[in-house]
Amino acid sequence: QKKMAEMESAGFQREKLVELYHREMDEWLQQFDARDPGFKDGVPQWRSALQTGNEWKLMELPAYWETRGLNFDGTVWFQKEVEIPADWNGKEISFHLAMIDDDDITYFNGKEIGRTSGCNTMRTYKISAALAKAGKGVITIRAIDYGGEGGIHGEPQQMYMEANGKKISLAGNWNYHTGVSMTGAPSRPLSPEGTGWPTSCYPTVLYNAMIHPFTVFPIKGAIWYQGENNVGFDEQYRVLFQSMITDWRRAW
């Protein structure tokens, strides 16, 4: 009801709703990041030097972290020390990091080199020739999983760094440290853009995409199979189902 009221106040204009979503998401991320031990006063603390200590553990990547025994929704920081070959000095370097579920921010030697949203999107980030220095370097990835499986996943051959016609694998052991858990976090804002948190949850999306286009055709009835992922909200269906059928009869 709150979201519908917001949509009505925006005149159901997509541009205004997208703008509202980005404002809400910025506020949500500020609150979320404030609880992350990897941040201090809004500044990432684990992005540069290789971190040490008993709280940092090893994980073999790529893999969903649940398959490595980490049952966790939230942020996980990953680090790996790499050796930049002498013949890569002053050459643009590409980092291929397979896929990351759900979102990530990636750093090299403390400098952000890219960020991506989307659990099934291949990550490829580059550092300029000016930043490419021979010797040791540190890749830091802050992965955010909002629910379900999380982690840096894919095939080992999809994790590597590349420059000067040569590839070096990045698969294998990475250091990791959990950040902030989704447990107790406020609900993430819904996106009207078709990205981010499942757009199918956004009011009007399923109806406009899957029901309304068929109202131009005559029908005798409807039969459907129902699956559920929100059994804890069963009481809502006493009202929702009746309202849905009433609306279908009106539409046809």
What does each model-identified segment do?
Residues 61, 66-68, 101, 105-125:
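Solvent-exposed beta-strand/loop surfaces of large extracellular or lumenal domains
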Residues 201-252:
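Active-site neighborhood of glycoside hydrolase catalytic domains
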Residues 101, 113, 145-147, 227-232:
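Solvent-exposed loop/turn segments at secondary-structure junctions
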Residues 124-135:
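A surface-exposed beta-strand-loop module
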Residues 85-89, 131-133, 247-252:
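Secondary-structure transition/capping motifs at alpha-helix termini
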